[in-house]
Amino acid sequence: FKLKFMKNYIFKDKKIVIASHNTGKVKEIRAMLYPLKVDVLCANDFNLKEPIEDGSTFEENALIKSSYVSKNSGIASLSDDSGICFCDLNNEPGVYSARWAGEGKNFSMAMSKINDSIKKVENPNYNCFFVCALSLSWPNGKNITVSGKVNGKFSWPPKGNFGFGYDPIFIPFGYEETFAEMHPQFKHSISHRALAFKKLKSLCFPSLKN
C-alpha cells in the first residue's frame, strides 16, 4: 500500500507553477526545484490574484493556494505557506505573519511590532519557531501537503541583509547568526522550508539528490 501511495504522487510533469507572489519565496523554491530540469513558472505568469487564505493552519492555507493556482492554470502547482511563531506572544503572528507586515509588506514595521510586544511580556524566554507547509496540487484534484519546523531565538536588533521577511530577527538553535546573516545556500540547507522540501522530495521528487 505504501509503495502504491508513493508512486501515485511521484512528479512526472514537465511544468510546475509556484503558487506565490512573494519574490523571496519564489526565489528559494525555484532554487530547490532547479535540479528537476522542468519549466518553473509562478502565479504572476498567469496574472492570478492571491486567493483568500482563511485556513486556521499553515497546511490549510498552503492547500488553498496550490489548489487555486493548479485549477486556474491547468498545471501542477507548488505552494508555500510559512510564518514565525513567538512563544512569548502565544505563538503569534503564526498564520498571520504576512498580514502583520500590512498591505505594503513592510517587514521592518512587523519586526518592530514583535519587539514592542515582547518588551511588554514579563520574564520573556524569547523562544520562537518558523513553520513551512508545502502543498503540491494537480489539476485533477490530487494533492499532498507536508510541513517543516525549525526552532530558535528572537534577536534584536535585526541583523543581516540576506533572506526576507522575519529572517533578520531569528537565530536558529545551534547557531549564532540570524537567517538573514547566513549565506542563502547555507540557510536553504537548514531552514523550515528545506526541512519541508526534504519530506516532499522523498514522496514526489525521488530523482532529486538529498
Model-identified regions with their sequence ranges:
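Short, Lys/Arg-enriched N-terminal segments with co-localized hydrophobic residues
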Residues: 1-5
